[in-house]
Amino acid sequence: MVLVQDLLHPTAASEARKHKLKTLVQGPRSYFLDVKCPGCLNITTVFSHAQTAVTCESCSTVLCTPTGGKAKLSEGTSFRRK
């Protein structure tokens, strides 16, 4: 009997579809972001799955709002993944 799937060397596409704990190497899917405020250009570090609304420290503009999973960035904000 020949195996159709190689279990020791899975493809990147099949690993991306799996649950984070079912992959060959376990790891989180969350990350931190550097978000730039569109008004004052101040940079704030935000968690990707933030559960509270994050505001800019200097001008009090809302940078992201929480959803059920990932936080939704506000219109006009630019970001960079850390």
UniProtKB/Swiss-Prot annotation:
Q: Which domain of life is it from?
A: Eukaryota
Taken from the record, one Pfam family name reads Ribosomal_S27e
Q: Zinc fingers (C4-type) span which residues?
A: 37-59
- What does the entry's PTM section describe? The N-terminus is not modified.
The free-text cofactor remark is: Binds 1 zinc ion per subunit.
Q: Which compartments does it reside in?
A: Cytoplasm
Instruction: Work out whether the entry's keyword set contains Ribonucleoprotein.
Output: yes
GO terms of biological process kind:
endonucleolytic cleavage of tricistronic rRNA transcript (SSU-rRNA, 5.8S rRNA, LSU-rRNA); maturation of SSU-rRNA from tricistronic rRNA transcript (SSU-rRNA, 5.8S rRNA, LSU-rRNA); ribosomal small subunit assembly; translation
Q: Which cofactor does it need?
A: Zn(2+)
Q: Which InterPro entries match?
A: Ribosomal_eS27, Ribosomal_eS27_Zn-bd_dom_sf, Ribosomal_zn-bd
Which UniProt keyword terms apply here?
Cytoplasm, Metal-binding, Ribonucleoprotein, Ribosomal protein, Zinc, Zinc-finger
Q: Which family is annotated?
A: Belongs to the eukaryotic ribosomal protein eS27 family.
Subunit structure, briefly? Component of the small ribosomal subunit (SSU). Mature yeast ribosomes consist of a small (40S) and a large (60S) subunit. The 40S small subunit contains 1 molecule of ribosomal RNA (18S rRNA) and 33 different proteins (encoded by 57 genes). The large 60S subunit contains 3 rRNA molecules (25S, 5.8S and 5S rRNA) and 46 different proteins (encoded by 81 genes).
What does this protein do, in the record's words? Component of the ribosome, a large ribonucleoprotein complex responsible for the synthesis of proteins in the cell. The small ribosomal subunit (SSU) binds messenger RNAs (mRNAs) and translates the encoded message by selecting cognate aminoacyl-transfer RNA (tRNA) molecules. The large subunit (LSU) contains the ribosomal catalytic site termed the peptidyl transferase center (PTC), which catalyzes the formation of peptide bonds, thereby polymerizing the amino acids delivered by tRNAs into a polypeptide chain.
This chain's protein is named: Small ribosomal subunit protein eS27B
Q: Which organism is it from?
A: Saccharomyces cerevisiae (strain ATCC 204508 / S288c) (Baker's yeast)
> Taxonomic lineage of this organism?
Eukaryota, Fungi, Dikarya, Ascomycota, Saccharomycotina
